[in-house]
């Protein structure tokens, strides 16, 4: 053994003695280096994310204009986690969560952990406590813009508090990022949009809360309404464009288009028809849609209704789309065992 190798072995032993077993290792020693995921609740978004859903143990930022569907996107993720037997928490800093709507999206409101904190510090401390417990699979913070520092709440209305919120977020994310990774929790931060004053060239839009969240996020999603979906003169929902602006786990800049229907959320039937047609799994002839020998209906809305009534055909098409894109969710079910193993390693 060379002197260099002996010195390295001694250093590794010293690190493990001081910081615990598993604090340093060769990457090849890790049994499973794949990124495990949880479905987003939208097949089109799973495809755009490139790995079949949200990566576990990472920070996700979802931002966009008002009423674009940001909270809907987050609630669908919560519903997916709960469906797989996981635990979800919603930190409602805006005090605006509609439990009736959440239930319609498939959220089990009886089991959902809900906090409506008074200050930004309180919200982030609650988030940290939940993450460090290792027992929560997803934490949603709605929204970063509503995380008001305690000093601002206790101060007078006209007082200046420059950079307070940015400092709060920066400090919180420094503490949270390691704990989120270790506990394999998905942390979704919903954010709003602001206009930068005096920008002549380039994009004047920015997100509140400073730059820290942009850096710490593994995935950033921009949610925008594209057009209204009408039936006659009645507006039934919006076609919404979700752009993957940043992605550390797959190629970025992919876009997903989904139908967000009022009172229903993301239309799974709509995206299956769109993706199926794109891949020629669903055939379109004129205005008629068909799958193999089965006619789905004339016009997109009729085809959507057919799939809603015939779940078996919908699942068959969905399976073919997932197979084509190689999407495989190895999500929540084995999380408890993984976290337990890591804790034993540390001990």
Curated annotation (Swiss-Prot):
Check the record and name the NCBIfam families matching this protein: tigrfam_recA
> Which residues are involved in binding ATP?
64-71
Identify the Pfam families for this entry.
RecA, RecA_C
Compartments annotated for it: namely: Cytoplasm
Please indicate which superkingdom the organism of origin belongs to: Bacteria
**In the UniProt record, what gene is named as encoding this protein?**
recA
Instruction: Kindly give the Gene3D superfamilies that the UniProt entry links to this protein.
Output: P-loop containing nucleotide triphosphate hydrolases
- GO MF entry, a single one: damaged DNA binding
Coiled coil (residue ranges): none
Keywords on record: ATP-binding, Cytoplasm, DNA damage, DNA recombination, DNA repair, DNA-binding, Nucleotide-binding, SOS response
Q: What does this protein do?
A: Can catalyze the hydrolysis of ATP in the presence of single-stranded DNA, the ATP-dependent uptake of single-stranded DNA by duplex DNA, and the ATP-dependent hybridization of homologous single-stranded DNAs. It interacts with LexA causing its activation and leading to its autocatalytic cleavage.
Q: Which GO terms describe its biological process?
A: DNA recombination; DNA repair; SOS response
* PANTHER family documented for this protein: MITOCHONDRIAL DNA REPAIR PROTEIN RECA HOMOLOG-RELATED, RECA
PROSITE patterns attached to this UniProt entry: RECA_1 (PS00321), RECA_2 (PS50162), RECA_3 (PS50163)
The cellular component terms of Gene Ontology attached to this UniProt record, alphabetical and capped at eight, are: cytosol
HAMAP family assigned = RecA (MF_00268)
- Its main subcellular localisation, reduced to a broad class, is cytoplasm
- Report the protein name in the record: Protein RecA
Say which family it is in.
Belongs to the RecA family.
């Amino acid at each position: 053994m060379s002197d260099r190798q002996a010195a390295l072995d001694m250093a590794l032993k010293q690190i493990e003695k001081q910081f615990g077993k598993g604090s340093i290792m060769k990457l090849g020693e890790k049994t499973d280096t794949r990124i495990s995921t949880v479905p987003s609740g939208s097949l089109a978004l799973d495809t755009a994310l490139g790995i079949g859903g949200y990566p576990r143990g990472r920070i996700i930022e979802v931002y966009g204009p008002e009423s674009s569907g940001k909270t809907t996107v987050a609630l669908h993720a919560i519903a997916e986690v709960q469906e797989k037997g996981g635990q979800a928490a919603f930190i409602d800093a805006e005090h605006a969560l509609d439990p009736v709507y959440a239930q319609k999206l498939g959220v089990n409101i009886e089991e959902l952990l809900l906090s409506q904190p008074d200050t930004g510090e309180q919200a982030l401390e609650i988030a940290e406590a939940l993450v460090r417990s290792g027992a929560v699979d997803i934490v949603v913070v709605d929204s970063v813009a509503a995380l008001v520092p305690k000093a601002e709440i206790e101060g007078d209305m006209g007082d200046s508090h420059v950079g307070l919120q940015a400092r709060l977020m920066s400090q919180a994310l420094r503490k949270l990022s390691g704990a989120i990774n270790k506990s394999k929790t998905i942390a979704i931060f919903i954010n709003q949009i602001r206009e930068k004053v005096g920008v002549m060239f380039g994009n004047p839009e920015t997100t509140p809360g400073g730059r820290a969240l942009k850096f710490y996020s593994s995935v950033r999603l921009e949610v925008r309404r594209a057009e209204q979906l009408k039936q006659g003169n009645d507006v039934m929902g919006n076609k919404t464009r979700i752009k993957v602006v940043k992605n550390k786990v797959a190629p970025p800049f992919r876009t997903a288009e989904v139908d967000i229907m009022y009172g229903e959320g993301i239309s799974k039937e709509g995206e299956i028809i769109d993706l199926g047609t794109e891949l020629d799994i669903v055939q379109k002839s004129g205005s008629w849609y068909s799958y193999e020998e089965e006619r789905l209906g004339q016009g997109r809305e009729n085809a959507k209704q057919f799939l809603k009534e015939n779940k078996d055909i919908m699942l068959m098409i969905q399976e073919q789309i997932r197979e084509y894109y190689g999407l495989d969710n190895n999500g929540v079910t084995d999380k408890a065992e993984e976290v337990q193993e890591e804790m034993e390693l540390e001990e």
